[in-house]
């Protein structure tokens, strides 16, 4: 999973016994280190989160506390504060600036996930993935270059709408042509992949389709209400474009389901 993010697909695959070895990769080092700490040292990260969460003051001062933790993280780049920021930011809509700084604001309506629940989730993930996972802080091309025909590469890169437009929400943007070149190389090597790339919000479509010569199967999957739309006070249904590499069996019926990550 070279654009790991929350590593939800890795966790899903491990939970359902779909693979016995995993690679979690991302260009944002603190995020990769957070995954590694969760999996390899679940007690350490759980204790740290509980300490940071419990130190929150009540009322309006909680906002200042969040901003203080965010400032400390942006200076230290530590996984403990990063976990708190992810779970405490508005609508869990995680945003990083181009320089790697955490840039999202605090959610004023809640205090973040309770430490007991986080501890339970962290230990469950550790049990699934400990001893089975490699961690790689590198570009997606580097992470995926060792994949073979016996592997499955799942990619959820920044969408064209957040790379080419004015709305830059991610630490590292992605050049579409570089992605297509890598997909062609993977197709030539017989490496199967699933790509979540662009889609549409309501009636508005984002991004161009992949080139026809890739012979990838495209389907639209309903993933629920748009987080960005919710932040803007609008209810907009989001559909993601999912591409299956040539050779992967497409479902008989295109799935229509909703899911939530962390």
Q: Predicted regions: what is each one?
A:
Residues 1-13, 24-28, 83-96, 138-140, ...:
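Conserved proline-anchored active-site loop of SAM-dependent methyltransferases
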Residues 121-134, 182-193:
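A structural motif corresponding to the C-terminal end of an alpha-helix
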Residues 27, 128-140, 174:
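Adenosine-cofactor binding site in Rossmann-like domains, unifying the SAM/SAH pocket
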Residues 97-98, 102-111, 158-178:
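Mobile active-site "lid"/loop adjacent to the S-adenosyl-L-methionine
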Residues 15-130, 247:
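Class I S-adenosyl-L-methionine-dependent methyltransferase module
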């Amino acid at each position: 999973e070279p654009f790991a993010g929350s590593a939800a697909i890795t966790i899903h695959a491990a939970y359902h016994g779909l693979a016995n070895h995993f690679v979690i990769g991302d260009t944002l080092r603190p995020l990769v280190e957070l995954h590694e700490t969760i999996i390899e040292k679940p007690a350490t990260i759980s204790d740290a989160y509980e300490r940071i969460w419990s130190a929150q003051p009540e009322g309006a001062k909680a906002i200042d506390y969040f901003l203080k933790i965010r400032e400390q993280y942006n200076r230290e780049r530590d996984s403990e504060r990063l976990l708190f920021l992810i779970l405490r930011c508005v609508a869990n809509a995680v945003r990083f600036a181009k320089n790697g700084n955490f840039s999202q604001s605090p959610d004023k309506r809640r205090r973040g996930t309770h430490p007991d629940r986080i501890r339970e989730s962290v230990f469950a993930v550790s049990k699934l993935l400990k001893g089975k996972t490699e961690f790689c802080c590198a570009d997606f091309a580097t992470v995926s270059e060792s994949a073979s025909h016996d592997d499955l590469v799942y990619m959820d890169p920044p969408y064209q709408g957040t790379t080419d437009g004015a709305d830059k929400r991610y630490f590292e943007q992605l050049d579409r042509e570089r992605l297509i070149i890598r997909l062609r190389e993977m197709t030539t090597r017989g490496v199967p992949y699933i790509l979540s790339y662009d889609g549409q919000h309501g009636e508005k479509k984002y991004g161009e389709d992949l080139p026809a010569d890739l012979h990838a199967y495209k389907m639209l999957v309903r993933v629920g209400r748009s987080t960005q739309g919710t932040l803007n006070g609008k209810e907009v249904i989001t559909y993601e474009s999912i591409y299956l590499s040539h050779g992967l069996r497409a479902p008989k019926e295109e799935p229509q389901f909703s899911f939530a990550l962390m």
